[in-house]
Regions:
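Active-site glycine- and acidic-residue-rich loops that bind
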Residues: 109-119, 204-209, 213, 221-223, ...
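Histidine-rich, glycine-flanked metal-binding segment
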Residues: 1-22
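His/Asp/Glu-enriched, well-ordered alpha-helical/loop segment
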Residues: 237-247, 251-336
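Metal-coordinating catalytic core of metallo-dependent amide/deamination hydrolases
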Residues: 73-77, 81-205, 275
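Metal-associated gating/positioning segment near the N- to mid-region
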Residues: 16-88
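Glycine-enriched alpha-helix->loop->beta-strand junction motifs that scaffold or abut catalytic
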Residues: 128-132, 194, 213-221, 236-242, ...
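A general structural motif
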Residues: 180-182, 202-204, 222-231, 250-257, ...
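Glycine-centered positions in the ABC transporter ATPase nucleotide-binding domain
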Residues: 1-2, 18, 62, 349-353
């Protein structure tokens, strides 16, 4: 095996016609499957069909390794996440075992530490062989992502269609649950993960105290820090700072928190995640590296930008066999071209040397 420049005379060689040949993308945090499980409010879709549709969308975006982010603990009083959880786990496992999945699917357990049942459910699900990443979250109002109470009210009241009275009661309940459960659940979950050698991510750290706590627990990744202060401190403590690719494509955070481009500009952005929109992953990398874009002043070179969606996330999750075009690593590859506005077009995708798209 070899990785060379120049002409090839091998019988099976392909001319990519000037397109990019890139390592297959590695996605650490996507809840895209949930949209396929519930394509409309009140509509439950068969889980096997949902997983295959999600998988097709993932591969078409150039993602060859995906950590499906499944939430434990539903803050929505009318939500079905906890009921859907075992169905999603089973369907992902079956698709992976049967070879029907085109991407390499791993599991990312997102643990809402303020929920009363989270720790109990986590202890059961962490035994699943596909679990390789865990994050700890606390979405209670008045801190982290929702330091501004009006943003919390606007987001959840609109999302869950709550009346003013229901929203007031919801806020009181979430604050009380956070005070009662979060600290103990976070400590217990991290302890289990350390015993199993699983990478752990913090979520929405906003202050130096949050970051010191995360670093003290030995966390590897800082997901979506909400302030420049927290992102800088996370970087200094050796946590890989992860931000949303949609944040780059859209030009800012939908929650009004720090912009990913701002963190890129000061050199503390390490990993991008497609979060809720798979096609944003490669698009964001090309924007950060591209000419004639709003990110011209940042100008990551292409290898650095691509590493944020391939090699760096792979290593952060403990995967050392992928994320780079190098002899001895998996032949997870994609062919893509960039249109004039840095919009990528994925042409072909290979996983383990086999074409899957």
């Amino acid at each position: 095996a070899a990785v060379d420049e120049g002409r090839s005379h091998l019988a099976g060689a392909e001319d990519l016609g000037g397109d990019y040949l890139l390592p297959g993308l590695v996605e650490l945090h996507t809840d895209n499957l949930e949209k396929h499980m519930t394509p409309r409010p009140g509509v439950d879709w068969p889980s096997a069909s949902a997983v295959l549709a999600h998988d097709a969308q993932i591969v078409a975006a150039g993602i060859t390794t995906v950590f499906d982010a499944l939430s434990i603990g539903d803050v929505n009083p009318k939500g079905k996440r906890m009921q859907q959880l075992p169905k999603m786990l089973e369907a992902i496992g079956e698709a992976a075992a049967s070879g029907d999945a085109r991407a390499d699917h791993r599991l990312h357990l997102r643990c809402e530490v303020s929920h009363p049942q989270t720790l109990e459910v986590f202890r059961e699900l962490v035994e699943h062989p596909l679990v390789q990443l865990v994050s700890v979250m606390d979405h209670a109002p008045g801190q982290r992502q929702f330091a501004r109470l009006e943003k919390y009210r606007e987001y959840y009241q609109g999302k869950y269609h709550l009346s003013d009275a229901e929203m007031d009661a919801f806020i009181v309940e979430q604050v009380a649950n956070s005070e009662r459960y979060s600290d103990a659940a976070r400590a217990a979950i991290v302890d289990v993960c350390q015993g199993r050698g699983l990478s752990v991510a913090s979520h929405d750290d906003a202050t130096l105290a949050h970051v010191r706590e995360s670093a003290g627990y030995g966390m590897a990744i800082a997901e979506f820090p909400t302030t420049v202060e927290a992102a800088r401190a996370s970087h200094e403590h050796g946590l890989q700072v992860l931000m949303g690719a949609p944040n780059v494509v859209r030009g800012g955070s939908h929650s009004g928190n720090v912009a990913a481009a701002q963190l890129a500009g000061i050199g503390v952005l390490d990993i991008l995640s497609s979060d809720y929109y798979p096609a944003s992953l490669l698009h964001a990398a090309l924007l950060l590296a591209g000419e004639h874009s709003e990110y011209d002043a940042i100008r990551y070179d292409l290898p650095r930008a691509v590493a944020m969606v391939s090699r760096t996330p792979a290593l952060a999750a403990g995967l050392t066999d992928r994320g780079e075009i190098r002899v001895g690593l998996r032949a997870d590859l994609l062919q893509a071209r960039a249109l004039g506005n840095n919009q990528p077009v994925v042409r072909q995708v290979w996983r383990g040397g086999q074409r899957v798209f």
